[in-house]
Amino acid sequence: MKNTILLLNGLWLLGLVACQPKSSSLSECPIVNVRSALQEETPISMKEDVVSIQYIPLETTDSCLISNLLNLQVTTDYMFMYNGKTEEVLQFDRKGKFIRRVGRQGNGPGEYSMISELAVDDSNKELSIFQYGGDALVYSYDGTFLRNDTTVKQAGGMYVFADGKRALKGLVMKPFEQAPWAGALQQPDGLLLKSKSLFPQGLSQDVCFMKEICFSPSTEGVLLFTACNDTVAGIYANGIEPAYVLKRENPTEYYMDIANINKFRDNTVETDQIIGVYDLFESPHYLYLRLYKGDAIFIQRFDKKTGELKSQRIPDDYLECSAAIPGGNVIGMDNDIDGGIPFWPEYVMADGGRAQVVNVDILLALREKGYLKQAPDVLNIGDEANPVVILYTFKR
């Protein structure tokens, strides 16, 4: 199933050893019994965690047509989007009104080539456009090019903490051209404070390759995960440390082979018994996981206070209505609040909420299968309309 859906731009991750704050050792990390939870279906209700939903239809004009949204950054006042098909960065306000294109593709000052991700520093009102193999380009929120950031050449993305420190996501371009770490903590002046690599012990360095990194920011920190390790790392303003242990209980050789450039594509590596992780995110009260095993995809939700773990399989209809991860999919939980689209918000908001995007093709596909009969009217958009951005606020 993992190969039938366009996979995350780069689910990438790390290995771990404690570094300080939240828990002092790996043994103190919360353990999430992923495999055993798959044996029993337990309904998961959005009402237990989500307190409000806001729908924002994006203005549609010839200047801002969105066909393939690959990244979204939601700040206090704006939304910045990377449209992969046209290689454009678009800026909208929080009501969905189009404001401007930011920068342009090219080889001159302030012009970008191949974009990997966007990042925002809401305190300083700055947008960073990360490129494969080049400096990050920094713009003000009014679209003015400010500078090249030469301190993040090895990063493919970042998250800025309130104190100005930055969590960096390692850049993966292609085999043997990658950052020496999967994640790092950096001072505002560019000095690296901590970094973390996560290859299995005993794997020769000349074959190590991390093809996927999951980099999931929240108000608490940034979660990092990689297929070759069951520990989820946390990058926080005061260090890097283990955050969770996912008991996938895959065969020992899987963890070695999935990180080996000579073996990770072999059909024998990802069998129907392997449990993989597409992506994950945190709310103040829960850890959410999107998993696959064979042809099935599951959502699991871990209660950070009680340790309760709920698991449910995603209906095949939702998979058939989806095109890609990230962006063009509704591979999520049933919306039991207002009957809207299945819930899986892939993007973080500056205020700690989460955001999801749905386009007209997905909405039409869901309706053809009999869904969205009670959905809010705002989801009735025209055939040529831009997507709708959905903002979720969580319980505190």
Where in the sequence are the language-model features?
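Conserved blade-ending motifs and adjacent loop-strand segments that build the rim/top face
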Residues: 244-269, 306-350, 364
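Short coil/turn segments at the loop-to-beta-strand junctions that recur within blades
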Residues: 62, 103-111, 150-157, 199-204, ...
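Repeated scaffold domains used in trafficking and secretory/extracellular systems
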Residues: 68-71, 113-118, 153-162, 205-213, ...
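C-terminal motif of bacterial Sec signal peptides marking the signal peptidase cleavage site
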Residues: 16-18
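Blade/loop signatures of beta-propeller domains
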Residues: 23-59
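Asp-box/WD-like beta-propeller blade repeats and closely related beta-sheet repeat scaffolds
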Residues: 114-115, 132-179, 194-204
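Blade-loop segments of beta-propeller domains
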Residues: 59-64, 68, 97-124, 131
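Beta-strand-rich domains and repeat architectures in extracellular enzymes and scaffolds
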Residues: 53-87
